[in-house]
Amino acid sequence: MTVENTALTLKKRFRGYFPVVVDVETAGFNAQTDALLEICAVTLSMDENGDLHPASTIHFHVEPFDGANLEKEALEFNGIRDPFSPLRGAVTEQEALKEIYKLIRREQKAADCSRAIMVAHNAAFDLSFVNAANERCKLKRVPFHPFATFDTATLSGLAYGQTVLAKACKTAGMEFDNREAHSALYDTEKTAELFCGIVNKWKALGGWPLIEDENEK
């Protein structure tokens, strides 16, 4: 593989990190006390031209953990009227995270990346809930970096002058259905599309690959 082609790989593009897009729906803003109710993850892949695309999607409704706080306003906002309804088909936090991490590890290994990194819109929020769930479930092997993220709110503010997901997507020329918003599945898919669009646009403008140092050649 030539130096130029080597640069057009997921491993090279993100310094060995494997980007995974995540969105959570919750019963409040406090990751320590409020329930995690829904989670979705979308992995990414890079084609032979160095363009980034969504790859696999995994999604779960999640049962509130024992003693979890449920804020009425949060439930009204995300449309989850009864978190305990059997019709949700919810699983435990541990079941959801283990299945998500199994997929991430498999695709991370295939991409020859050393660690996963979370991509999310206002990523600190999503990462805080995932980290809190990891602690509650006493999960030792967590693929995500504990604090580093790619935040599409920041990136879209730079690229499109918009930080709200719906407005950023529309400014980027994407379709966005406000009736579907605040579903972890829909929001993750749109965040993945937005992130890929920003990365690919930067490449098209000549921002990547970087000019290789002579020593690296």
Swiss-Prot record:
Subunit structure: Homodimer.
This enzyme's EC code(s): 3.1.13.-
Superkingdom, taxonomy of origin: Bacteria
Gene3D superfamilies associated with the record: Ribonuclease H-like superfamily/Ribonuclease H (3.30.420.10)
Residues bound to Mg(2+) 2: 23, 25, 182, 187
Obligatory cofactor(s): Mg(2+)
One Pfam match: RNase_T
Upper taxonomic lineage: Bacteria, Pseudomonadati, Pseudomonadota, Gammaproteobacteria, Vibrionales
Bound cofactor: record note: Binds two Mg(2+) per subunit. The active form of the enzyme binds two Mg(2+) ions in its active site. The first Mg(2+) forms only one salt bridge with the protein.
Protein name listed in UniProt: Ribonuclease T
Gene (UniProt): rnt
Protein residues bound to Mg(2+) 1: 23
EC class name: hydrolase
Any one GO biological process: DNA replication proofreading
Reported function: Trims short 3' overhangs of a variety of RNA species, leaving a one or two nucleotide 3' overhang. Responsible for the end-turnover of tRNA: specifically removes the terminal AMP residue from uncharged tRNA (tRNA-C-C-A). Also appears to be involved in tRNA biosynthesis.
Active-site residues per Swiss-Prot or TrEMBL entry: 182
UniProt-listed PANTHER family: DNA POLYMERASE III SUBUNIT EPSILON, RIBONUCLEASE T
